[in-house]
């Protein structure tokens, strides 16, 4: 593959050059997060609201529009806007909190991650800013009025974009060098009349000085040189005290923000406005505070520092934009003192844009259409823009910074008290920087698979961070997410480690054994934790826990069940089967150079066999998770007195045992003498358990062992449902719940599960997600991968005939599901994108129709995007699907 300029930068970064020092690491929402919650009751969304955010200094991380910062978030840059009508300066995206949204928290803005290279040498972002007053109150009131049953009331529904009275604000970043960033902001007036727009590029320091018993020395921003054609802001932390949770001295030094000459510099401090937040009696004597620019620009108050210095600054531009016209602002953030800093900004932006084109031309598969390339590139852009500084010291957060002003003691018992070791200053891949601006371990595993296509080093780094001592618990558990690090998530980390390692080895030609080995050692600890914690009966059947599929069952699986009942879960057991197979595969890879690992490969093979057998026999209790009558796996509710109840819900839970699939070719494993010997002994002497999980397939190339928790007949019966449009096969991929439950809901003890293809009617885990019918990319992706393994093992010998009489091979089933997932985003024959449903603005308007959002999940019947609108995280897997299914 020909190398491009971006490939060269990635190689330089691997060698130590800091191309990643600056990036889109600024969050889009720090208010309402657990990190900023110091309440007595753990009500994070109410402790620091959107309305308070403009006035309160954040403790653990900043936010903004189209923002960037350095990798430790010392110095931040973002854009604020004002249309002359809004009641507040638009400094950060707005959305509803869970108690306001009729389906949980919900972003109410339109912005798009248009482009980004892996080193962020080029980035592009689009924000659509209405010219009329933003309807904050109406959005809150109407969504509250609708309740949980009605559709969400969106910003477009307010008709604020009628007659195209809005600005398209594009922000482009281009790195001239590692510490030299060119910034180009262009705002287009799409409306029929001239309109004024205030643009305020912000430059500020994160507040790290105000939290302890004694204030630390502060950095400063002051005016710099003003010459023909530009003004300057100079930020300097040289004399400030450094970050206290890094083992080394770090500063950004002296930085200059050059801007066009009509920008008026404004200065204040990144300090809380105590009087506004807590009343007049709370005055701490500080005159220049965080919300000064809002009050100055919107209300005309004299709130900025006339001495022209502070820790927060901006350049205030006022531009009148003609109808159909645009205005451009050029800026440059650099360590260098430049005589003509803005002269070559346009040329540098253009150059980096063309380099990005060349880079992605090498990434896109040959068989991808122009529209599929657009989808893939914007998916990569979303993954890159979703990087965020995740700054959180749980020990300090629990106890408070200032011993003289400690937070309420009660909060120590609410969440995360067992995670005091967790201390992050890392740049992490977020699920969604507004809706989920915190890492989620199982989400992150899926992110890395798509990211590895363009930046395998970053993908490997992300996987290792979750296993690093400052994240992984000493007992072996991988932290789930900040709302409760102790929650259980599906153990997909070994799968991601193995897959990213394999992708990197194939593409680079070099096997990163060191990465694989160190991850394997930490995953051994994690496996031991799962065995000791979650298999409470020691019968290789796993129970309890959240496991990521929020509302898929009758109960909230994070909570204990009444009466001492235990939920024995087919998905938990299936996930553990997948865990075992991936660990076996990694151990065999490591055994190529160190035969010691063959014994561990045997261990995980045997664990897998016992898990598979247990799903069939449940320790001789007279029931199992497989239901022969229905041909499906069901959860079992087991009571203390020994009686049990099958939960006959046909959902993703019952399909997950299909994920636990691997194939071993006899010729390939022959190189591992000890493993092969142990394997053969097991096959010959433990037929009672092996016959359920190992199928020998003879072919022209020799014998293949198909390792499957489900036997061939069971596979065929499950495949029937995967091909049935009245069950799991949607026009847009794999449904999470069978459509059969539309007419036949499952009811038990007043709880009910029915087919809900759109938003959820219940509010388990906040209510903003739904696993009772919609399509989810991560589980659909794993299903496709499992089907491909089965197809390679069985070939065309295993096939099913659907109810319509069509014959399906396993490979055809896999391709059908993959094609339908890709079709969610790609224009159909009529030019419409299913993900945008019936929203005509997105379907037909030339300024909207080619800007994509990668929603959290998708309607089970229409493919319309639902949930978080920027969860490029795991929905970015569409980039992997395009890569794999358009290779030729």
Task: Map each language-model feature to its residues.
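Acidic, mature catalytic/reactive cores of soluble proteins
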Residues: 1-59, 65-67, 72-73, 80-888
């Amino acid at each position: 593959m020909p190398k491009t300029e971006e490939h060269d930068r990635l190689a330089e970064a691997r060698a130590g050059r800091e191309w990643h020092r600056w990036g889109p690491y600024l969050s889009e929402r720090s208010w309402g997060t657990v990190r900023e919650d110091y309440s007595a009751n753990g009500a994070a969304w109410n402790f620091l609201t959107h309305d308070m955010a403009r006035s309160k200094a954040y403790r653990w991380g900043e936010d903004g529009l189209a923002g960037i910062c350095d990798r430790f978030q010392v110095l931040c840059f973002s854009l604020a806007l004002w249309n002359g009508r809004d009641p507040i300066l638009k400094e950060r995206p707005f959305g509803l909190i869970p108690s306001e949204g009729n389906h949980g928290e919900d972003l109410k803005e339109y912005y798009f991650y248009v482009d980004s290279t892996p080193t962020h040498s080029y980035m592009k972002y689009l924000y659509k800013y209405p010219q009329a007053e933003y309807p904050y109150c109406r959005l809150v009131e109407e969504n509250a009025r609708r309740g949980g049953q009605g559709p969400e009331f969106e910003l477009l529904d307010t008709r604020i974009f009628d007659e195209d009275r809005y600005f398209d604000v594009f922000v482009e970043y281009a790195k001239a060098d590692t510490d030299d960033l060119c910034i180009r902001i262009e705002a287009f007036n799409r409306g029929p009349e001239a309109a004024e727009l205030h643009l305020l590029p912000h430059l500020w320091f994160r507040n790290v000085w105000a939290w302890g018993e004694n204030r630390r020395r502060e950095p400063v921003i002051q005016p710099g040189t003003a010459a023909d054609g530009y003004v300057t802001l100079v930020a300097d932390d040289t004399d400030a005290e450094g970050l206290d949770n890094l083992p080394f001295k770090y500063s950004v030094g002296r930085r200059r923000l050059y801007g066009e000459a009509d920008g008026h510099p404004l200065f204040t401090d990144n300090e809380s406005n105590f009087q506004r937040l807590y009343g007049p009696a709370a005055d701490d004597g500080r005159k220049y505070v965080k919300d000064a620019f809002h009050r100055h620009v919107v209300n005309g108050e004299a709130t900025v520092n006339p001495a022209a210095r502070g820790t927060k600054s901006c350049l205030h531009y006022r531009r009148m934009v003609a109808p159909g016209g645009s205005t451009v602002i050029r800026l440059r953030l650099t360590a260098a003192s430049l005589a003509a800093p803005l002269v070559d900004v346009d040329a540098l932006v253009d150059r980096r844009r063309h380099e990005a084109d060349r880079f992605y031309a090498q990434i896109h598969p040959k068989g991808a259409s122009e529209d599929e390339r657009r989808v893939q590139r914007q998916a990569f852009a979303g993954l890159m823009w979703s990087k965020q500084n995740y700054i959180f010291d749980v020990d300090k957060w629990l106890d408070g910074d200032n011993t003289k002003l400690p937070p309420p003691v009660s909060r120590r018992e609410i969440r995360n008290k067992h995670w005091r070791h967790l201390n992050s200053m890392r740049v992490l891949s977020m699920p969604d920087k507004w809706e989920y601006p915190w890492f989620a371990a199982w989400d992150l595993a899926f992110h890395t698979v798509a990211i590895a296509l363009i930046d395998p080093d970053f993908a490997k780094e992300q996987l290792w961070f979750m296993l690093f001592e400052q994240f992984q618990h000493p007992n072996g558990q991988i932290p789930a997410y900040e709302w409760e690090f102790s929650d259980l998530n599906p153990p997909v980390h070994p799968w991601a480690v193995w897959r990213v390692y394999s992708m990197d080895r194939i593409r680079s030609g070099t096997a990163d054994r060191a990465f694989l080995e160190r991850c394997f050692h930490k995953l051994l600890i994690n496996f031991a934790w799962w065995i000791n914690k979650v298999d409470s009966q020691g019968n290789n059947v796993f129970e309890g826990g959240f496991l990521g599929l929020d509302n898929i069952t009758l109960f909230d699986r994070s909570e204990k069940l009444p009466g001492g009942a235990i939920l024995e879960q087919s998905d938990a057991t299936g996930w553990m089967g997948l865990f075992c197979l991936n660990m076996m595969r990694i151990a065999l890879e490591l055994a190529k150079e160190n035969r010691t690992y063959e014994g561990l490969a045997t261990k995980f093979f045997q664990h897998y066999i016992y898990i598979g057998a247990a799903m069939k026999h449940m320790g001789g209790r007279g029931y199992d998770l497989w239901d022969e009558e229905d041909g499906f796996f069901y959860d079992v509710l087991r009571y203390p007195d020994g009686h049990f109840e099958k939960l006959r819900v046909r959902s993703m839970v019952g399909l997950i045992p299909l994920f636990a699939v691997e194939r071993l070719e006899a010729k390939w494993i022959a190189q591992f003498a000890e493993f092969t010997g142990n394997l053969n002994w097991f096959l010959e002497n433990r037929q009672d358990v092996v016959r359920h999980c190992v199928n020998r397939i003879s072919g022209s190339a020799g014998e293949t062992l198909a390792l499957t928790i489900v036997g061939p007949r069971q596979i065929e019966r499950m495949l029937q449902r995967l091909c049935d449009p009245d069950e799991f096969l949607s026009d847009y991929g794999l449904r999470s719940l069978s459509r059969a439950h539309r007419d036949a809901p499952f009811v038990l003890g007043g709880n009910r599960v029915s087919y809900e293809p759109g938003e959820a009617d219940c509010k388990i885990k906040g209510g903003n997600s739904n696993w009772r019918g919609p399509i989810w990319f991560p589980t659909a992706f794993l299903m496709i991968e499992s089907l491909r393994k089965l197809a390679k093992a069985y070939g065309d010998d295993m096939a099913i005939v659907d109810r319509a009489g069509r014959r399906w091979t396993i490979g055809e089933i896999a391709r059908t599901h993959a094609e339908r997932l890709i079709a969610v985003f790609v224009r159909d024959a009529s030019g419409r994108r299913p993900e945008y449903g019936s929203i005509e603005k997105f379907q037909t308007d030339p300024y909207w129709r080619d800007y994509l959002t990668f929603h959290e999940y998708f309607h089970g019947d229409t493919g319309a995007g639902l949930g978080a609108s920027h969860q490029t995280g795991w929905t970015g897997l569409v980039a992997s699907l395009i890569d794999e299914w358009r290779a030729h």
